[in-house]
Amino acid sequence: MSEIKTDDPKRGIKLRGADKTARIPIKVVPLQEKLKKPEWIRAKLPSRKFFEIKDILREQKMHTVCEEASCPNIGECFSKGTATFMIMGDICTRRCPFCDVGHGRPNMLDPDEPKNLAESVKAMNLRYVVITSVDRDDLRDGGAQHFADCIKAIRETSPNTKIEILVPDFRGRLDIALKILAETPPDVMNHNLETHPSLYRKARPGANYQHSLDLLKRYKEMMPHIPTKSGIMVGLGETDEDVREIMRDMRAHNIEMITIGQYLQPSDGHLPVLRYVTPEQFKIFEKEAYELGFTNAAIGAMVRSSYHADEQAAEALRESHGGCGHH
């Protein structure tokens, strides 16, 4: 799927932190005094396996969102031999001020990326792979065909590997994107709501809460056997009741799996953390999620969208009568 713009001198320049968020509608104002990080926010130290995987990734010229988004669980996940791959480059066309991925005009798609990704998955011997991407508003299908090409390539070389895709919102391109991803389905379809709709102007400029809900609802209607999943962060200014409202909205749109984790500010140029949710409150959210009918809820301070995704999916795939029919 070809890009809309070609020979652009600004293509490939990546802005991060304050440079990235300088032109969003609501300015990022640092707190006068940062909230102290509580003792329950702890990441595990990396093992030797972590460095082995890093070597494989550099060899294959692959980007993982684990590295690009400065994920706190990178040591633990790499050490278990799992990784979330970010396709279509590491430059995003959006400027969300909670996110540590760079903004700019992305490079052309790499036609070898699906093959390289499949080789990485095979070399790392992954049982479960998560594929995500930057937003590509410069592509006519938002990058859906590239996702499909990556799924096909992995299915060919690692037929027993389960594949979860964590997709952008395909704004303005949803019909074509859903059609493409229904023709080449993953094992789990994930798209994050990120936060409460009242905070979208501040945290997700350019996105729409109802559009994101509709994306997952429509995909579920097209592909009833594929589990759907979404996630949010807490600490951006939402209340506990806001979190409950999001959970109810997810269930009303047939979303089956949920992740909720603590937002951690990547740099002073990003949105500040306005609260640290306690482990006790995360437990309450988890209990309420199961009461609402989610098949799986990964909820806790250090949870990120793909954290323990393999364990989450095993549960959901059992619920969806033993898988999706392509293995």
UniProtKB/Swiss-Prot annotation:
Keywords: 4Fe-4S, Cytoplasm, Iron, Iron-sulfur, Metal-binding, S-adenosyl-L-methionine, Transferase. InterPro entries: Aldolase_TIM, Elp3/MiaA/NifB-like_rSAM, LIAS_N, Lipoyl_synth, rSAM. CDD domains: Radical_SAM. [4Fe-4S] cluster 2 binds at C92, C96, C99. Residues 78-295 form the Radical SAM core domain. Coiled coil: none annotated. Gene3D superfamilies: Aldolase class I. Its EC number is 2.8.1.8. GO terms for molecular function: 4 iron, 4 sulfur cluster binding; lipoate synthase activity; metal ion binding. [4Fe-4S] cluster 1 binds at C66, C71, C77, S306. It is found in: Cytoplasm. It catalyses: [[Fe-S] cluster scaffold protein carrying a second [4Fe-4S](2+) cluster] + N(6)-octanoyl-L-lysyl-[protein] + 2 oxidized [2Fe-2S]-[ferredoxin] + 2 S-adenosyl-L-methionine + 4 H(+) = [[Fe-S] cluster scaffold protein] + N(6)-[(R)-dihydrolipoyl]-L-lysyl-[protein] + 4 Fe(3+) + 2 hydrogen sulfide + 2 5'-deoxyadenosine + 2 L-methionine + 2 reduced [2Fe-2S]-[ferredoxin]. Its cofactor is [4Fe-4S] cluster. Binds 2 [4Fe-4S] clusters per subunit. One cluster is coordinated with 3 cysteines and an exchangeable S-adenosyl-L-methionine. One of its GO terms (cellular component) is cytoplasm. Pathway: Protein modification; protein lipoylation via endogenous pathway; protein N(6)-(lipoyl)lysine from octanoyl-[acyl-carrier-protein]: step 2/2. Pfam families: LIAS_N (PF16881), Radical_SAM (PF04055). HAMAP family: Lipoyl_synth. Belongs to the radical SAM superfamily. Lipoyl synthase family. This is Lipoyl synthase. The lineage of its organism: Bacteria, Pseudomonadati, Pseudomonadota, Betaproteobacteria, Neisseriales.
